[in-house]
């Protein structure tokens, strides 16, 4: 499937235990963008990493200590942060919390293998509405 359904219902959408006190739920995606809900247990760590995707993170609840390219800030409900492609970033959550991550392009590693195999790149480049 090259995109998610138009509507996503939290009580019907799979929540994946990704280990280390983290759980992830896909909210929606296509070939351009992806939104994911992530639960952090108290004390959970999202270890520093980099990726080619732009990322915006919105804090739904809890307190997160975000480090982006060596700068650490404390973010709480209603706060957000932006990570440019290849920015070194990570977060700890001393309270437990929930955040929404948005990626562009989507994180292929969060999807089943082959999710975008049927995308016609030439068609995408000429008219993205046709994909």
Please tell me what each predicted stretch does.
Residues 60-61, 76-77, 95:
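A cytosolic small-molecule/anion-sensing beta-strand core signal
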Residues 1-32, 116-131:
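A short, N-terminal "cap"/entry segment at the start of jelly-roll beta-barrel domains
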Residues 53-64, 69:
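Glycine- and acidic-residue-biased ligand/ion/polar-headgroup-sensing regions
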Residues 85-109:
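Ligand-binding loop in jelly-roll beta-barrel domains
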Residues 66-68, 100, 108-116:
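Anionic, Ser/Thr-rich low-complexity intrinsically disordered regions
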Residues 45-47, 65, 81, 85-90:
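Histidine-centered metal-chelating micro-motifs
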């Amino acid at each position: 499937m090259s995109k998610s359904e138009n509507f996503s219902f939290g009580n019907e959408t799979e929540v994946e235990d990704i280990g280390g006190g983290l759980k992830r739920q896909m909210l929606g995606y296509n070939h351009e963008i992806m939104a994911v809900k992530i639960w952090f247990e108290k004390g959970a760590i999202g270890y520093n990493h980099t990726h080619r995707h732009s990322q915006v993170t919105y804090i739904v609840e809890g307190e997160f200590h975000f480090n982006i390219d060596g700068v650490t800030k404390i973010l709480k409900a209603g706060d957000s942060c932006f990570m440019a492609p290849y920015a070194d970033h990570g977060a700890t959550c001393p309270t437990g919390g929930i955040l929404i991550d948005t990626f562009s392009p989507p994180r292929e590693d969060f999807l089943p293998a082959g999710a975008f195999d049927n995308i016609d790149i030439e068609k995408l480049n000429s008219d993205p509405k046709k994909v």
